[in-house]
Amino acid sequence: MTTTYAVLSEGLEKNYGEVHALRGLDLAVPEGTVCGLLGPNGAGKTTAVRILTTLTAPTGGRALVAGHDVTRDPAAVRRAIGVTGQYASVDGDLTGRENLRLFARLAGLRGRAGRARADELLERFGLGEAADRTAATWSGGMKRRLDLAAGLVTRPRVLFLDEPTTGLDPAAREQIWTAVRELVEKGSEGTTVLLTTQYLEEADRLAGEIVVVDRGRVAATGTPARLKARIGARAEVTVAEPGTLARAAAVLDQLTGGRPVLDEQRLTVGVTVLDGALDGTLTLPRIIRELDAAGVPVTDAALRPPTLDEVFLRLTQPHGTAVEAATADQEYAA
């Protein structure tokens, strides 16, 4: 079965003078999926999104969005996409219903069609009861949901969500996550979502595929589970006697090939089980058996997968603030 890609870029480059924001970025996002774009500040995420949404031109390479070349046919790209940023673009002096009808008119949906689409989205995002109140009286989470609804007025084939829950409290963030999940899982419009976020939990919860960007290139790509498997699980044991810490570390070193970390205060030894070196269902029992054979009594033992935060830190490198500042300044100077 042939895969159709909603977003496809090959060798995408962007230079700002001597600053190389993108250095050959390759993306392939299948239709009807949620792809999370992660990376440290200055990695090139925002630059990539600006190119894919036709807000800036690439220096090199090519990109297709919904089958249209972003350089050769930017108007067609704009007709096929929706964009929602980290700041709600709604008008506080208008009601929620008036906001969506305005967006509908701007998108060419007038009269009955525009009113029907606005009403449909208000109900879909749980905003019907507040629809006729001015948006200025709404909570931050409600405004962000309205902003997300506005991005869907035209039934876009690709929706770009740029840090959509920044600054929201946990409850409001969960509401946005639910709306995005339902958009892809239950929706009939076939929308593809490209999500950039600073919340790694957000990418873990929403994205079927994650692309980690570092220094303008793709550092890694895969499902959250596969990315976590790349750095392995972490085994940690708590010994009963302080004098057995070194022995416990030696056993873990021999079993896993990792570098045990000792904590004399907590009487623990932790080590990363690299790249699935041992089967996940067998690792912990085997560790306990080997420790027992070595005369190391333990009071606790655990094996846990790494968090996406740990994956992120392992796969990315520290950036220089000078490069970050130069890129950001030139991107937003216009």
Where are these regions (language model features)?
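C-terminal coupling/interaction segments
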Residues: 275-334
